Amino acid sequence: VSVRRERIDVSIDSDRGVFMISVAAELAHMHPQTLRIYEARGLIQPKRSPKNTRLYSQRDVERLRRIQQLTAEGLNLAGVERVLTLERRLRELEGDADATG
């Protein structure tokens, strides 16, 4: 008996909100209340479902892990916010440099 297996390529949109808060918290190894605090501080902006449920993307989970890493290194949330802003700005500048050659 031969079994034919086909490879299916699945591209996942890393910005699509798919994880409810409990799942995102588990993936990031955090308590759901921590995610709510980070949202209130503006560190994370999850998408919302039509019923206003928070939906976190893979990129959001990665950002939560980065926040956790920075706080473990001793930064407070104001410091974390500053570092994330500077990292975003650096990516923008690198993108501009790549575009202009």
Q: What residue ranges belong to the model's regions?
A:
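Arg/Lys-rich, alpha-helical DNA-contact motif
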Residues: 1-20, 26, 40, 45-46, ...
